[in-house]
Amino acid sequence: MLDKIKKMKNLLSIIVCLIFINALSAQTGTLGLASKAAIPNMMANPAQTGDARMIIGLPGLSSYQVEQQSSFKLSDWLNTSGGKTYLSFDKFAPLAQQRNDINANIGIDLFSFGMRIKKNNFFSIGVQHFSSVYMSISDDLVKLAAEGNGNTPSVVLNEESAYASQFNALYLGYSRNLMDDKLKVGFRVKRLQGLNHFQTDNVNFTLTTSQTSIPAYAVNVTGSMKAQAAGILGMATDSVLSNNLGSNITSNLTNMGNGMGFDFGVSYQVTDKLSVSASAVNIGSISWNKDFAGKVELVGTGKFEFSGITTD
């Protein structure tokens, strides 16, 4: 019993460290692939089923996946002084690249059930949720945020882009142990339910600052943006679809977009202390119902005034 408590303490310590590292690193992936002290993360590799004969997973207690990638490290923008750590805006502009990418992916088991039959066969069923967000911002936008618009009469923003998606997956999985348990292979077949999809096709804005409006800086904005949206976001772009959402909400939410996908994974125990594994997950596609997809197009001009921020 004490040994199990010690293992759980070690596991919690590792999780806390990973969360801290995630906030500072440019690229991280947090997965639990082969833990005997907790339910294994079959989400990352369907061949990794652990030693349990039966598993029941619920949100927060089973498989999870958290990944983030960026072209910069948050720790590069931190300063420490007087025992305090804070963001240094002075570092923003010098560290900005021509393109600054940010990508984040989250996956979680909403429910999972697995059972081992005759030692070598493992069957599983479950529901997973996945969310992903991607943004790309130019160094001009970073400099505008860090330095303000007072010293920059005109800024052209045409390299910005964004992508986001959400979907659920109902899966059936199978894994088998081979070669005296040294080799494990597994796969999952998924029924995909699309929830949201958004992507920009074209962004082109010009911000021009008036140098004569004192004390406020008047900013004129001209340009255009084209984007595509589907699912709940797609309905938000169409007033008719938005009004009809509540008329049959269950049917609408289950028929916005559907598709098929699969996962495949292998794991090989080279020695008692060394194992190697590989997997391909979330391979598939979703076809969106045209009644729940729309295009967003914004063309025009605008003007706003910024009088500054008062600080002590």
Residue ranges and their predicted role:
Residues 27-312:
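Subset of outer-membrane beta-barrel
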